[in-house]
């Protein structure tokens, strides 16, 4: 199973990724992890990427694609892999097809923006312990205070409504192009496109995703 998982920040993608990788016995591949591993291992591509990152630049697509090809040639990918957050752009998706890396399925966890804003902007965190609350779904006993220590809870910058909306706008801009690209591919290059309602309970989303993937 060679699949790509798409989903906005806060859509519950990480949880579903764990279910998919466990069900098919495949690794989850994210470009961030891959870059860190290549840099740590000191591979030629890793060294090139490190130089660019150290200079404050963005790693070029050709380096990323090269790393992906190296990564998916490893033994643990013999039954497939799950791409998470890659390809991120149309250029990357096209380069993957040209490089002969085909996908069996593209899975999109679809959650309306209003739900994601509600989920994320309601989060409150106790920094010292990492305990997380939600003003609506999992409120502390005393508003704004940690249940255990009574210390203040904060809203992380990442969870502020304005920030969430900006991240969602970027996600939609990138993803719509990818969805369009994959849905137009024909013949052996064409993956199955699966769109799942991510507002359902976690287990219901899991059942729908795995069912559509043939598990």
Swiss-Prot record:
Enzyme class label: transferase
Entry's EC annotation: 2.7.4.3
Keyword terms of this UniProt record: ATP-binding, Cytoplasm, Kinase, Nucleotide biosynthesis, Nucleotide-binding, Transferase
Places the protein is found: Cytoplasm
Region spans: LID: 122-159
Biological processes annotated in GO: AMP salvage; nucleoside diphosphate metabolic process; nucleoside monophosphate metabolic process
Function: Catalyzes the reversible transfer of the terminal phosphate group between ATP and AMP. Plays an important role in cellular energy homeostasis and in adenine nucleotide metabolism.
Listed name of the protein: Adenylate kinase
Taxon lineage: Bacteria, Pseudomonadati, Pseudomonadota, Betaproteobacteria, Neisseriales
The encoding gene: adk
């Amino acid at each position: 199973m060679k699949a790509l998982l798409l989903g906005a920040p806060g859509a519950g993608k990480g949880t579903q990724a764990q279910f998919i990788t466990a069900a098919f016995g495949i690794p989850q591949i994210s470009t961030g992890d891959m870059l860190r591993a290549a840099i740590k291992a000191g591979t030629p591509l890793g060294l090139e990427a490190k130089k660019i990152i150290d200079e404050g630049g963005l790693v070029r697509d050709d380096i990323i694609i090269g790393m992906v090809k190296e990564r998916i040639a490893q033994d643990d990918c013999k039954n497939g892999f799950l791409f998470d957050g890659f390809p991120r752009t149309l250029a990357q998706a096209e380069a993957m097809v040209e490089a002969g890396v085909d996908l069996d399925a593209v899975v999109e966890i679809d959650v309306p923006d209003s739900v994601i804003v509600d989920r994320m902007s309601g989060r409150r965190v106790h920094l010292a312990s990492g305990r997380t609350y939600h003003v609506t779904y999992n409120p502390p006993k005393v508003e704004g205070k940690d249940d255990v220590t009574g210390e203040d809870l904060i809203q992380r910058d990442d969870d502020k409504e304005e920030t969430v909306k900006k991240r969602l706008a970027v996600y939609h801009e990138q993803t719509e192009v990818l969805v369009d690209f994959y849905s137009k591919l024909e013949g052996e290059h064409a993956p199955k496109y699966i769109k799942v309602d991510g507002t359902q309970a976690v287990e219901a989303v899991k059942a729908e995703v795995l069912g559509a993937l043939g598990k």
